[in-house]
Amino acid sequence: MMGIGVAELNRLVDRMMASFVGVGAVSILNYASKINTVFASCLDQTVSVAAFPTMSEFSAKKDYTQLSKLINLCLSAYLLILTPITIYIALYNDVIVSLAFGRGKFTIDNITLTGQVLFLFALGLIFMPLRSIATNLYYSLGDTKTPSYNSMIGMVVNIGLNVILGYYLGVKGLALATSISYAVITILLLANLKKFSNWISVEYFYRNLYKPLLGGVFLLISFLLVKHIFAFDVFLCSFMSFILSLAIYILVLVLTKTKEIIYIINFLKCKLYGKDCNS
């Protein structure tokens, strides 16, 4: 509960700081935050919420081998999914904002600035679900203090960076401060897992970090190539970039024998056809 309270307080602080950095900054921050939250919430609901009961079950049975496998799977799956999303937002943030809010009194300048803020929020997007999984792991192990303390540290970091970066970068600095605070919380949570090192191991996750990063490199290259080819139409370019680059990304993951991508594909098939994924 404390962690939720800290998150709400963080958002309140962001809005308060935004009111001091420029005209319309609060609205810009809210628009960008809404889009960013859509991506984060979808993943959080589909993976974290589904995994938490199983985490609790393994913890209650003290089956730490299976618990470690589940944690590694969740962390790796999150990273595989979030890598293309983050790169896509980085390259097409203005298109996303234009599709979502580009009407009425929302000007080109508003779209550009909101897109830049969205990009800086997206830098922290990759840490938000990882933090959620790590937090659920602590809760399943009966440790509620560590996530709360780390959230409080993140809040202090966020407030401090809001003041510094907000002064120099305006509303963009507030978004960057939020992303950095998410990164700090996540890194601390994963680092503090060493207290459970006799039971929980996330070495598999660390050893296989190169796979989504390698896929991300090919994804970025394909994004840039498609962006150049379809430069005559921004919206067609963004659509084709997503489809073709995602196909290349998945191909790279399959070629590197990334088992999480097979799990994700099977999971989606189960959901699509209404089958029991555990059978």
Task: Mark where each language-model region is.
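Transmembrane helical elements of multi-pass membrane transporters/channels
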Residues: M1-E57, L219
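Helix-loop junctions and terminal segments of transmembrane helices
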Residues: Q45-D63, S68-C74, A134-T135
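Short alpha-helical transmembrane segments in multi-pass integral membrane proteins
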Residues: L70-L91, R103, Y168, K172-S197, ...
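Interfacial segments at transmembrane-helix termini and the short loops linking adjacent helices
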Residues: A90-G124
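Membrane-interface junctions at transmembrane-helix termini in multi-pass inner-membrane proteins
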Residues: L123-I153, I164, Y168
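Alpha-helical transmembrane segments
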Residues: A134-G142, L190-R207
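Membrane-proximal transmembrane or re-entrant/amphipathic helices at the cytosolic face
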Residues: L224-S279
